[in-house]
Regions:
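Short, charged/small-residue-rich alpha-helical element at the C-terminal edge
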Residues: 234-349
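Catalytic Walker B motif of ABC-type/P-loop ATPase nucleotide-binding domains
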Residues: 161-165
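A short, flexible loop at the N-terminus of ABC-type nucleotide-binding domains that lies
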Residues: 1-8, 12-25, 75
Length: 349
């Protein structure tokens, strides 16, 4: 039976004597065995939220409860129920062995001496480091150190695990191993709070998703809830070479209220993603129509020597260099929904 391991109720967190509002009116919960992912642009408040849930920071107002214990009123009891994985190369005694590091942190976590050996061996096996117990920490790969961070955080049998960007900087194989470890950890009935910039990772792992921007919740729910909130009916992509006639921001505004258009540099070209707000039976044709309208209008205004563009006869018929030739339609992804909800309309990263 699932039970609530984390409750965040109307939490605010201010910095610089109240001049900076890092988190504003945040409320959510996590059940045992559930993975909740928090996503947002840099500075959205993700890491601040994780630190408050770990008791490293206290809320300016509101309350956070871990296993029913308030993180301010009963900080020590609340802290005992949570494991924090910040990751990175720091946090261990690099020239000591893996097992020596684990024994040290077992003492910190309050694991009794009689239980330390068995719990350490069990955790190292769980994270795939059972054969590395005698190795010095500095000899471990980055992915192995990240898994060691998870083993350390699980000392003392916490019911809640906090993972802040657990796969950042890892190669693809190490990232896959970490994701598999996260799934197996949740299967042990441990609630997990995850932050990540990888939308693919969030799609694969999260039971529920919470999108925040400027410290405020935009939307939370299962993947279909996020898609519904984004109000995207279809997605199209195309690219163009740099143009002396138009800036990329000009092109983004051509679609008005029909779509939100995002652009980024892709080598020597501009890559555009069109998030259609209104249903389109023929999105490719509509893109050509929009381009024809604005390009012809600009050329008329500049009194171009050309007599105009060839009439539109169908998709792919335009030969003008300002017309996209690689338009593709594809299914919506979480990244599309996230950008539609929380990202600046001119940036795609």
């Amino acid at each position: 039976m699932q039970r609530t391991v984390l409750e965040v109720n109307h939490v605010f967190r201010d910095f610089k004597q109240g001049r900076v509002h890092a988190v504003q009116d945040l409320s959510f919960s996590i059940a045992s065995g559930e993975i909740l992912a928090i996503v947002g642009i840099n500075g959205a408040g993700k890491t601040t939220t994780v630190k408050m849930c770990s008791t490293l920071l206290t809320p300016t107002s509101g309350s956070i409860r871990i296993n029913g214990y308030d993180t301010v009123v009963h900080a020590e009891k609340a802290r005992h129920g949570v494991g924090l994985v910040l990751g990175g190369d720091k946090g261990f005694y690099a020239r000591s062995s893996v097992s020596a590091n684990m024994r040290f942190f077992a003492d910190v976590a309050g694991v009794s001496y009689h239980n330390q050996r068995s719990q350490i061996a069990q955790l190292l096996d769980r994270v795939g480091l059972g054969d590395k117990a005698k190795d010095k920490v500095y000899t471990l790969s980055r992915g192995q150190r990240q898994r060691l961070h998870v083993a350390r955080a699980l000392l003392g049998d916490p019911q809640l695990l906090l993972l802040d960007e657990p796969t950042v900087g890892l190669d693809p194989d190490a990232a896959l191993q970490m994701r598999d470890l996260i799934r197996k950890t949740a299967a042990q009935n441990i609630g997990i709070l995850l932050t990540s910039h990888s939308m693919q990772e969030v799609e694969e792992l999260a039971d529920r998703i919470l999108i925040i921007n400027s410290g405020k919740i935009c939307v939370q729910g299962i993947l279909s809830d996020i898609y519904h909130y984004a109000h995207i009916s279809a997605v199209s992509t195309f690219s163009l070479p740099p143009s002396k006639s138009f800036e990329q921001l000009d092109i983004c505004t051509w679609f008005a209220d029909e779509a939100r258009v995002l652009c980024r540099a892709a080598g020597t070209r501009w890559k555009f993603t069109v998030l259609w707000r209104k249903p389109q039976e023929q999105p490719k044709r509509r893109i050509y129509e929009i381009f024809r309208e604005h390009v012809e209008e600009s050329e008329r205004a500049e009194q171009s020597d050309r007599s105009g563009l060839k009439s539109f006869e169908g998709e792919g018929s335009q030969s003008h260099s300002l017309f996209p030739s690689d338009i593709e339609n594809r299914p919506m992804t979480l990244e599309d929904a996230f950008l539609a909800i929380a990202q600046d309309p001119t940036e795609l990263s």
